[in-house]
Amino acid sequence: MKLKKPYFWDDKELNLISILFFPLTIFLFLINLFTFKNNNKIEKIKSICVGNIYIGGTGKTPFSIELNNILKTLNYKTAIIKKFYKNQKDEQKLISNKAKLYCENKRIDSIKKAIKEKKEIIIFDDGLQQKNLNYNISFVCFNTENWIGNGFLLPAGPLRENLKSLKNYSAVVLNGNGESTKKIRNQIKKYNRKIKIFETKYNPINIKKIKNSKDYLIFSGIGNPATFKKTLMQNKIKIVKSMVFPDHYQYTNNDIKKIKKLAKDLKTNILTTEKD
């Protein structure tokens, strides 16, 4: 059973649940701190990693795909590497429809395949926390609305690493809906003055096909459903009902029947994300 993101992860004020998780957070932090780091340089091929330190919903997969498209227009032979997870077939399918994808249980096996097929640049969708690989360029993606949530490490908060780890990376990508990023930029520069900061804004490519004169029931099983809803609202899409499922949710026939029935009862159209 997949669970939704805990609400207290994005609570800006200290709360009891986070405090109760502190002992486990400290334990996991110490394990990570003393884990042997063997940063092997990836030979024979250039590598770019697009990852995050806030777990889920930061826009790294769309950014990886767009980065791949840009490099292809520059005539580079590219591919995207994603570690295989049985419960992430939605992202695997999304990427494979748009780019050459290597998706093995071990990233090193995907690297070997890319080299064998004479790729010039490989883009890792996720992988910043894999300590035995040293990438040529590393991007850290954030969602500007959530930023770092409550600022605590897992499981008390949503962070895989604290902000001090930004000193190890090449650039930050702030994905959002046009929110002010001044405070975020200042925080980033405290930990790495030289780091490059890029900003993107979510812009649905097929928004003109969606009639804003109609009512919509929307549903999604993504890392940040609030951003999906906000993007539609900014484009003047009238949302009557919003249904939220866990990230990487595997929809059943019964789920689809319920969604269709609810839309029929509400007399609305149905709208979801490309990944869903």
Model-derived regions: residue spans:
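Phosphate/Mg2+-binding loops and adjacent switch elements
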Residues: 86-192
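A short, acidic, amphipathic alpha-helical segment used as a generic capping/interface helix at domain edges
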Residues: 250-266, 275-276
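A transmembrane-helix-recognition feature enriched in membrane-embedded lipid enzymes
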Residues: 2-46
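Conserved beta-strand elements of the Class I
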Residues: 77-81, 140, 215-219
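Residue-level signal for inorganic ion chemistry
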Residues: 27, 61, 95, 125, ...
